[in-house]
Amino acid sequence: MAKPKIKFVPDSLHVKTGDIVYVISGKDKKMTGKVLKVFPKKGKIIVEGINIVTKHLKPSQVNPQGGVVQKEAAIFSSKVMLFDEKTKSPTRVGYEVRDGKKVRISKKSGEII
């Protein structure tokens, strides 16, 4: 029998809820969107307007009509980079201690995120 694959899950994510991110791979490559939700244990995020999937809903008490709904699905956080508003391009995230607090900075512009 083959060994089971070990899934890699990062200790922490480089993006937070509310960040503007740039998709670097996949079907939505070169698109930007706002992070709506973060799943750190799975290493995934949900981005507004990215990875839209069609979901078929059965009729229920909440939704008696049922039907077809389009919504955002989660993508791996490694597929996105933080989008720098100042340089209008994707950037890596760095960390610095300023005034006794650890802050995230943009590697391209040096600005605090």
UniProtKB/Swiss-Prot annotation:
CDD domains linked: KOW_RPL26 (cd06089)
Lineage top rank: taxon: Bacteria
GO cellular component: cytosolic large ribosomal subunit
Species of provenance: Fusobacterium nucleatum subsp. nucleatum (strain ATCC 25586 / DSM 15643 / BCRC 10681 / CIP 101130 / JCM 8532 / KCTC 2640 / LMG 13131 / VPI 4355)
Cross-referenced InterPro entries: KOW, Rib_uL2_dom2, Ribosomal_uL24, Ribosomal_uL24_CS, Ribosomal_uL24_KOW, Translation_prot_SH3-like_sf
Gene Ontology MF terms: rRNA binding; structural constituent of ribosome
UniProt keyword Ribonucleoprotein present: yes
Subunit structure: Part of the 50S ribosomal subunit.
A biological process from GO: translation
Protein's UniProt name: Large ribosomal subunit protein uL24
Family: Belongs to the universal ribosomal protein uL24 family.
Keywords (A to Z) from UniProt: Ribonucleoprotein, Ribosomal protein, RNA-binding, rRNA-binding
Role according to the record: One of two assembly initiator proteins, it binds directly to the 5'-end of the 23S rRNA, where it nucleates assembly of the 50S subunit.
